[in-house]
Structure formats: C-alpha cells, structure tokens
Amino acid sequence: MTESTDKTTHFGYQTVREDDKAGLVQGVFTNVASKYDIMNDLMSGGLHRVWKDAMMDWLAPRAAQRLLDVAGGTGDIAFRFLKRAPEAEAVVLDLTESMLIAGRQRAEAEALDARLNWLVGDAMALPFADNSFDVYTISFGIRNVTRIPDALAEAYRVLRPGGRLMVLEFSQLPNPGLQKAYDLYSFNVIPPMGKVVTNDRDSYQYLVESIRRFPDQESFASMIRTAGFDQVKYRNLTFGVAALHSGWKL
C-alpha cells in the first residue's frame, strides 16, 4: 500500500501533490476515451500509426512471446504485436477503465480477444511477479506517470532476463526553429481541436503541457540506464516530434 505524501509533482504546468496526480490523469483519459483514437489521428495527421509501426519494426515480435503493454489504453500496440507474433500473448494494463473498455470492444471486432487480458493497474506498482514478461511496451504513457523512475524500475523487475523495454513518447525537436513551430501548433491548435471533437479543452491543454515538460531524448535514455537496462538506444521519429527508446534486461 502506498503511503500518503505531501511531495509535489507536475501535472502539465500545474504543481500538484504526488498523491493527486494519478487521479487527475485518470480523469483526463476518462473524459476523452470515446474519442481517443480519432483525436490521435487528427492531432498527428495519422503519423501516430506510422510511429507505432516503426516501433513494431524495431521490436520485431517473435512467436510465443509474452507482452505487457502499460498505459495500453485502446490496444493499438498490443494489436500490432499480436498480429506479428503467432501464439504470443499480451496483457494490456491501464489506469483508466474506460480506455480498457474501448480496447476490449476493438479486440472483439478484430478477433484478438482470446490472446489478450485487460487489467486496471498502476505502472509504479505492477501486480505481477518478477521475471514475468518477454517484452514491456509503453506508448505515449510514460510522461503521465507520477514518478517515472519507479515505473522504469517496475518494468525492469517484471521483465525476464533477455527481455526488452520499448518506449514510444513525444519528445523534443533538436532543431530550435522546428521546436518553436511545433510549440505554436501544439498550444494553439490542439486544445481548441480537443474542445471541438471531445468538448474538453482542458485535457488537451494538459496533453501539450505534459509533452513540453518531458525530458529530452538523452535525458530519458539516461533514466532508462539508471533503472538497470543495458544497450539503451533511441531513434527520433519525424525530426524528434516523437522518439523510440529501447533497452534490454541482460
């Protein structure tokens, strides 16, 4: 059981109590769950699909592997994994039940539900034994975690020796001019778009603020190494709008 704490953390550009952040994040995704996939397409111009395919290309799923997809939401990563890996199994864990409900409905439509398990849970306290999974993925979720080092430590714990971590997350553009243009788009277009599509501007204001606060590629790679992972590498996607980070438990 997690003890109550008066420590603070960030929720976008706001400062909040650590104990409150998970509930705030849960509220964001409860509000947008029904339109989550549509908004991803609109915000990225469909690029999130290309990025997720690039994630699978680098990951190269193998038959009979066991995947844990954390913050797995509506199942995009797990579905891609299972379609490439015969006889593989996947557990999708998410803090927000409404996201998992949407994912289950998609899994039934794609006839993948028999190879999937869905679980409400916290990335910082995974309900699994040590050395339980071959692959751990988290896509556009790690920046929402209250204590990222704790989540990375849990990822390391539940992976088997030889297991692989793969993180897809929005990142920082190395080119200052492109970063400025991207910020203008993010802060001036995405929240109003969220208001029109989901009737929820605030959740998408949080989204763009959380992206801007997330560590750059090298800093996040260092955090992964500190958690114990070896052979940590990253690849920029679309000039650094997003990045893939990979690490191994050896």
From Swiss-Prot:
Methyltransferase required for the conversion of demethylmenaquinol (DMKH2) to menaquinol (MKH2) and the conversion of 2-polyprenyl-6-methoxy-1,4-benzoquinol (DDMQH2) to 2-polyprenyl-3-methyl-6-methoxy-1,4-benzoquinol (DMQH2). HAMAP family: MenG_UbiE_methyltr. PANTHER family: 2-METHOXY-6-POLYPRENYL-1,4-BENZOQUINOL METHYLASE, MITOCHONDRIAL (PTHR43591:SF24), METHYLTRANSFERASE (PTHR43591). It is an enzyme of class 2 (transferase). It comes from Dinoroseobacter shibae (strain DSM 16493 / NCIMB 14021 / DFL 12). The gene is ubiE. GO terms for molecular function: 2-methoxy-6-polyprenyl-1,4-benzoquinol methyltransferase activity; demethylmenaquinone methyltransferase activity. One of its GO terms (biological process) is aerobic respiration. InterPro entries: SAM-dependent_MTases_sf, UbiE/COQ5_MeTrFase, UbiE/COQ5_MeTrFase_CS. This is Ubiquinone/menaquinone biosynthesis C-methyltransferase UbiE. Keywords: Menaquinone biosynthesis, Methyltransferase, S-adenosyl-L-methionine, Transferase, Ubiquinone biosynthesis. S-adenosyl-L-methionine binds at T74, D94, D122, A123, S139. It catalyses: a 2-demethylmenaquinol + S-adenosyl-L-methionine = a menaquinol + S-adenosyl-L-homocysteine + H(+); a 2-methoxy-6-(all-trans-polyprenyl)benzene-1,4-diol + S-adenosyl-L-methionine = a 5-methoxy-2-methyl-3-(all-trans-polyprenyl)benzene-1,4-diol + S-adenosyl-L-homocysteine + H(+). Belongs to the class I-like SAM-binding methyltransferase superfamily. MenG/UbiE family. It holds the Pfam family Ubie_methyltran. Its EC number is 2.1.1.163, 2.1.1.201. Pathway: Quinol/quinone metabolism; menaquinone biosynthesis; menaquinol from 1,4-dihydroxy-2-naphthoate: step 2/2; Cofactor biosynthesis; ubiquinone biosynthesis.
